[in-house]
Amino acid sequence: MAQEKSALSKAQKAAVLLLSLPEEVSMNIVKELSEEELQKLFALAKDLESVPEEEIENIAEELLDEIKKAGIKIKKPEEFIENIKKVIPPTLAEKFRGILELGDAEKILKEIEKVDSRILASLLKNEHPQTIALFLSQLSPKKSAEIIQNLPEELKKEVVKRIATLENVNVQYVKELAQILLEEISSLGAKEALKLEGTAVAAELLNTLDKETRELILQSIGQEDPLLEERIREKMFTFEDIRKLSDRDIIEILKVVDKNTLMIALLGAPEDIKQKFLSNMSKRAAKLFLEDMEALGPVKKSEIEKAQRQVVNIIRKMIDEGKIEIGD
């Protein structure tokens, strides 16, 4: 259905659009108009009757059609920032530039996430541990954990320790390092810092590792810096921490956790943790659950640990959402 042409003149349409824009937008336009242009607009505006919403929409659509016909293209964000520097504070312009840099870094890091973790580990292993820590802190915990598992043993501990003590990350630096890595991989076939809580990043990363590797790294860190080890552990939630949950919390977990995943997870669990779940089921449900567990037969240790991590991830998500609370 064709839109109905407005009977207003182009100058009147300009006045209508200006008056219908949000104040902060219209004020920026007004700053760019000459005194003569403003006088004309206000003269037209005072004579305008109330304009229906539908007509305002039609006028806006007409303007878009005119823009398309004229072949006007949207400015690059960098050019736009240069233009608006005239009417916004310098600090705000710098903030916008930082956002652009962050966006560029995120695009490059998305490409890095697709690269085989073993290749990334082999490229990173000769970098300084601090450089590796900075880089891994900007990747997903899963990807970071995979890379760490492929690093030399002594380097693993050093990298996690440095992640835990990070406070600021320069976006531009991470972006440049990621770009270099991508270039090296290809050859094989916000000015503002991001604020980080290093211990939280390290804890999230360690939670994705298998229990043996996790404990080895934590113990190594503890030998050099017991306080740092304690701070990391405080941020973590492990399968053994289920003991700290109340019966009410266990009931909430049972509502959302996959039954088969829980069965496999409990195959390798201490008896008290197993009973923690069974005691919060009805007698009939607990009996059926145990029968189904026995019917599973032998399960690989790696599958049990994977199931335990899945249960932990659900619990951590519920803690973050405030649905359950971890006790002392």
Swiss-Prot record:
It holds the Pfam family FliG_N. Gene3D superfamilies: 1.10.220.30, 1.20.5.2020. GO terms for molecular function: cytoskeletal motor activity. SUPFAM superfamilies: FliG. It is found in: Cell inner membrane; Bacterial flagellum basal body. GO terms for biological process: bacterial-type flagellum-dependent cell motility; chemotaxis. It comes from the Bacteria. Keywords: Bacterial flagellum, Cell inner membrane, Cell membrane, Chemotaxis, Flagellar rotation, Membrane. A motif (Part of the EHPQR-motif) lies at residues 127-130. The record marks R162 as: Part of the EHPQR-motif. Transmembrane segments: none annotated. Belongs to the FliG family. FliG is one of 2 proteins (FliG, FliN) that might form the rotor-mounted switch complex (C ring), located at the base of the basal body. This complex interacts with the CheY and CheZ chemotaxis proteins, in addition to contacting components of the motor that determine the direction of flagellar rotation. This is Flagellar motor switch protein FliG. The gene is fliG.
